[in-house]
Every structure is written in structure tokens, then in C-alpha cells.
Design a protein with these regions (language model features):
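Metal/cofactor-centered catalytic core regions of large enzymes
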Residues: 98, 109-435
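Short acidic/polar alpha-helix capping motifs at helix-coil junctions
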Residues: 1-5, 173-174
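Cofactor-cradling patches in redox/metallo enzymes
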Residues: 3-114
Length: 435
């Protein structure tokens, strides 16, 4: 019992956090990630590992992060919550300035839940022992010599957690395989696997529905999460959109945002390749850029990151040849920005990011005004009828089909589409482009 209590205290002091980020909530996500890094709380990859669910984004009809409000949340948030084993807690972050308060509230709720679960467990044991005692007396009184039940029927809710009976294609919550001809005419199992919208190091709001034969991706459907249009500009594109609208924006501020955006993408890229230490270092530099670090400081921080990534033979071996997008095809699909400049595979796109990080870090202190005609954000041109991430999303099926499933997340991370761009309602640059 003392060991169990010690383990409970350890879990509460350093809870595993599952981040569920809505499109349009990049500013809040960055604030949450920075605070989690400061506290040393780990981000987990799925509900089974989580203690604390942190939902990031606007919540209509609710005050900022207060209360549960089951009726107000989306189905995917509700599904995540029910998939987390007790004891658990949940908070909603809508204000980047109140992240610390939200996490403290979640920690308090988690501790309270641990306490309540401990006492509920004791009460359940006492109730079960009382029932067994009564049944034993009844059996003796009636001369019943049949063996006692092993109480397997008491755990009838187990099927609910596995969603058994809710979907004939599921067994204990896992999709069953169909059969179909592969490209060689062989009959192989076909498995339908969804990725997203909530995964660690994954574009917020992106759902990919994959059809697999063996470990090879045969078909891909892209389904962004439906969210209401937002009047706020996408966080990463904000400096260029403000300049286009006639506001004064310094070139240094735009360079700082570009540097942080590419560091954010690189952090995801390193994480999905299994280079966790490099991902953490990259995110630290990203946070320093957003916190206003000088050009000298940022340059001194990014140089070793760039050298280390460029010299990594393992990283090159893992990512070379994945998701090749020649410039001609990229241009035909409307792709602009780093993916067009790279004219190649996932490794080439990473190199373009690294080069842009080095140049933008050195320009963070420039005070001259940003030219309103410079409408190229981190993902590409902002003066086109569709946002640049739309073209990146449209390119995903062709890049993923025929690849191994294990490579899919690396390819997605090497493009890193920003679904915030799809939620921006009637952006000024979009209207202007039709005029």
C-alpha cells in the first residue's frame, strides 16, 4: 500500500500530458508547450499513457477553461477523454496568458481524482467482500454445493472500452482487415487506419485515412477537422498579413516569426524520426525566438543545431528518398515556399528549413519596415486564391501512396501543413487576389 501511494504521488507530480490542439490555436499551443517544458511534464502519444488531457483552442459557449461542459465539446475530444484511464483530469486552454493557471487546476483535479479513486476502490472491495460473505451464507443455508462464481460477469463494461458491438469492423477497438488484390495481383489483407486529428508532433486538425495492404499505403484521403471560420490571422502568417493590410511591421519581426515557424516544423520532423533530444533543443530555440531573443543569441543557438542536423548520417539515411516532390510537380500543384525550393525529398525540405533558420535568426533585429509586397510566409505565398497549406494537403496523397506506413509520418512532418491557414475567414489577401 505504501508503494502504491508513492507511485501515485510520483504520477501526480509529473503527469503525462496529452495535447489536443484545434486548428487556429497555434499561439495557445506554443504557450502550453513552453510551460510544459519549463515544468518538465512529458507529452504522451496517446490516451492510454495520459494522466492529463489539455485541450487547446476556442471553446464556444464556455468560459476560458472552466468546467467540463460535455455537451459543448466535439466528438473527437469526448472520445479522447473516454479513452484515458482513471484517474485523470482535463483542462481547456483558450488564453495563452493563463496556461500556468490551467495546468495548476488540472494538477489539483488530478490529485483529487487520485484520492477519490483510492477511496472508491476501498469501498468497492468492502462491498464485494460483503456480497461474497452473504452469498456464502446463502449457499450454506440452502445446501448449494455448486462452485462459486469467479465474478467475470461483473466486468461487463470491458466491452464498452473496446467499443465492441459499436462497429462490426472492430475487435477490442482495433480495425479488422478486409482483403483485396495488391499491385502484383496477390490477395492481401486490407486495413483501414486513421491518423489524427490528435497525435504527438502532428499538424493540428489533420485526419488522414489510410488504406494499407501489409505495411504499404495504397490509398489516402485527407480530411481536415471542420472548424468555424476565424477572423484572426494564422499565427505564423500574421506579420505578412498585417503588412499587406497596411500596418507597420519590421523586417526583424517577420524574420523572427519565420525563424520560429521553421524551428517548430523542424522540432516535429526530428521527433517523428526518433531524435527526441534534437527535437527538445530545437523547441527551446523556438521559444527563445518567440520570447524576443536577440539576433546574436539566436544565431549562437541555431548554428550548432544546423551543423548537427546536416552532419547526421542517420537522419540522412532515414529521410532520403521519402516523399519526393520535384519542383515541376510542386509548381503544377500550386505548392510554393520551402517545398518548392527543395525540389526533392523529405531530407531536402529539411535542409531548406535549416538554411532559412540560419538566415532569419541573423535578421531578427532589423528595424526597417517589411515591404507589403513581400507576401511569402513560412509555407509559401500568401497572395494566391488558396492558402499555401491547401496545396501541401493536396499533395499528400500522391506522396504517401506506395510508401511504407512507417514513413508516412516523416513525409507529413517534412511538409508540415498549417491548418490554421484553412480556418482564416476571408483573409484580405484572398479577397485582393480576386480583384
Amino acid at each position: 500500500m505504501e508503494l502504491r501511494r508513492a507511485l501515485v504521488r510520483a504520477a501526480v507530480s509529473r503527469p503525462g500530458v496529452l495535447l489536443a490542439v484545434s486548428p487556429g490555436a497555434t499561439r495557445q499551443r506554443l504557450a502550453v508547450e513552453a510551460e510544459l517544458a519549463r515544468r518538465g511534464w512529458p507529452c504522451v502519444s496517446g490516451p492510454a499513457e495520459a494522466d492529463l488531457l489539455v485541450v487547446v483552442g476556442d471553446r464556444e459557449g464556455e468560459d476560458e477553461g472552466e468546467g467540463e461542459g460535455e455537451g459543448e465539446e466535439s466528438d473527437w475530444v469526448s472520445g479522447l477523454w473516454h479513452g484515458i484511464p482513471a484517474p485523470k483530469a482535463r483542462v481547456w486552454v483558450t488564453d495563452p496568458e493563463r496556461v500556468a493557471d490551467a495546468l495548476e487546476r488540472g494538477l489539483a483535479d488530478l490529485a483529487r481524482g487520485q484520492y477519490e479513486e483510492h477511496h472508491e476502490h476501498q469501498q468497492h472491495q468492502q462491498h464485494q467482500q460483503h456480497q461474497q460473505h452473504q452469498q456464502h451464507q446463502q449457499h450454506q443455508q440452502h445446501g448449494d454445493t455448486a462452485p462459486h462464481s469467479d465474478h467475470r460477469g461483473h466486468d461487463m463494461h470491458g466491452g464498452h472500452h473496446g467499443h465492441a458491438g459499436h462497429d462490426m469492423g472492430l475487435v477490442e477497438g482495433l480495425p479488422m482487415a478486409d482483403r483485396a488484390d495488391d499491385r502484383d495481383g496477390l490477395r492481401l489483407d486490407v486495413l483501414h487506419v486513421p491518423l489524427g486529428p490528435v497525435l504527438a508532433d502532428w499538424p493540428a486538425g489533420l485526419i488522414l485515412r489510410l488504406t494499407l495492404q501489409g505495411d504499404v499505403v495504397q490509398e489516402v484521403t485527407v480530411e481536415p477537422v471542420t472548424t468555424p471560420p476565424s477572423p484572426r490571422p494564422p499565427f505564423w502568417d500574421e506579420p505578412w498579413l498585417r503588412a499587406t493590410a497596411g500596418e507597420h511591421v519590421s523586417r526583424g519581426n517577420a524574420a523572427r516569426r519565420l525563424c520560429a515557424a521553421h524551428l517548430d516544423s523542424l522540432g516535429r520532423f526530428f521527433a517523428v524520426t526518433g531524435w527526441d533530444d534534437m527535437a527538445a533543443r530545437t523547441r527551446y530555440v523556438r521559444d527563445r525566438a518567440l520570447a524576443g531573443g536577440s539576433a546574436a543569441e539566436l544565431t549562437s543557438l541555431v548554428r550548432p543545431l544546423i551543423r548537427r542536423a546536416q552532419r547526421s548520417r542517420t537522419l540522412r539515411w532515414l529521410t532520403t528518398g521519402l516523399g519526393t516532390l520535384p519542383a515541376e510537380q510542386a509548381r503544377h500543384r500550386g505548392v510554393t515556399g520551402p517545398a518548392l525550393v527543395a525540389d526533392g525529398d523529405a531530407y531536402s525540405r529539411m535542409l531548406v528549413w535549416l538554411d532559412a533558420v540560419g538566415r532569419s535568426a541573423a535578421a531578427c533585429d532589423v528595424i526597417e519596415a517589411l515591404d507589403a509586397a513581400e507576401t511569402v510566409g513560412p509555407r509559401g505565398r500568401l497572395d494566391t486564391p488558396a492558402p499555401p497549406s491547401r496545396a501541401l494537403l493536396d499533395s499528400l496523397p500522391r506522396l504517401l501512396e506506395g510508401t511504407e506506413f512507417a514513413c508516412a509520418r516523416i513525409i507529413v512532418a517534412s511538409l508540415d501543413p498549417d491548418l490554421d491557414e484553412l480556418t482564416h475567414a476571408q483573409a484580405p489577401w484572398t479577397v485582393h487576389s480576386h480583384g
